[in-house]
Regions:
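Short acidic-hydrophobic, aromatic-tinged amphipathic segments that line or gate anion-handling sites
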Residues: 1, 122-125, 190-193, 252-260
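Active-site-proximal region of nucleotide-activated glycan assembly enzymes
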Residues: 59-123
Length: 261
């Protein structure tokens, strides 16, 4: 089954982006509820585990909401307050909440503070498809591109124009099948989309990694004890918080677009 995509786009202002996209997101949420209702009537499941999808629940099932973001962070307290009130309104329609982090919440920090959540919550540990077994490096820098457009392409452009990488063995995983940019340096190896086995191999044979500070990536790299460079997506307050929270821990260094490595 494939539920409708929210197709969220992030601009420089998260607040403005969400406001402009609000009507479309609400319409998608309603479609999601209808599709889940159809699936439940056809297959009659007992439990639904929803990965951050507000509409993936049903009155006839036990509904589990999976998220690490129970306490949205924003520089403006009024915006954080409103966002959290709205988010909790949706969360409380579920029966319980699972948090993909350890009991100490070392990965999510304040994001997973559940003190205001009225349904049962439990930490289930980090979720990752990557099995780390570090080997002698053959890649000096592995670049993992991700996220919505246009920020993904802007990130890619900043990497290929970074003069500090001109003498390094660089491997880029673009994370998309979209048309490649022109004029990649000769010392760059480019891959569009790779499978789990290939990605694991690249990570295990890299001397350092440059990527966004998305939570899925942070979970994948939690035991990677070589240098990790995070560049948060501008306007994504979650990534900005996570980058700041992890900066200086376990080999993490936060950079700005275009900054030398």
């Amino acid at each position: 089954f494939e539920l409708p995509s929210y197709k969220v786009r992030y601009g420089n202002s998260l607040t403005l982006s969400m406001f402009l996209q609000g009507p479309r997101l609400i319409a998608t949420y309603r479609k999601e509820l209808k599709e889940v209702d159809r699936i439940v009537k056809e297959w009659q499941p007992d439990v639904i585990i929803s990965d951050n999808r507000f509409g993936a629940r049903h009155k006839d099932t036990h509904n589990i909401y999976l998220t690490h973001q129970l306490n949205i962070q924003h520089k403006k307290k009024s915006i954080a307050l409103f966002a959290n009130l709205l988010h909790r309104r949706f969360i409380h329609r579920f029966d319980e909440c699972w948090i993909p982090d350890n009991k100490e919440r070392d990965l999510s920090g304040r994001l997973s503070d559940n003190s205001e959540i009225r349904i049962p919550c439990k930490c289930i540990g980090a979720l990752s498809r990557i099995k780390l077994s570090l080997e002698d490096p053959t890649i000096e820098l592995l670049v993992l591109l991700s996220g919505p457009e246009p920020s993904r392409t802007q990130f890619e452009e900043s990497i290929i124009s970074n003069e500090s990488l001109s003498q390094k063995i660089v491997c880029i995983v673009r994370g998309t099948d979209s048309k490649r940019l022109k004029n990649y340096p000769a010392n760059f190896t480019i891959h569009n989309i790779v499978d789990q086995e290939e990605l694991t191999s690249f990570i295990n044979t890299s001397a350092a990694i440059l990527c966004r500070s998305g939570y899925s990536t942070i979970m994948d790299l939690q035991d990677y004890d070589r240098p990790k460079y995070y560049i948060p997506t501008k306007g994504q307050t979650e990534q900005e918080y996570l980058a700041e929270y992890h900066d200086g821990k376990k080999g993490v260094k936060v950079l700005k677009n275009g900054q030398n490595i």
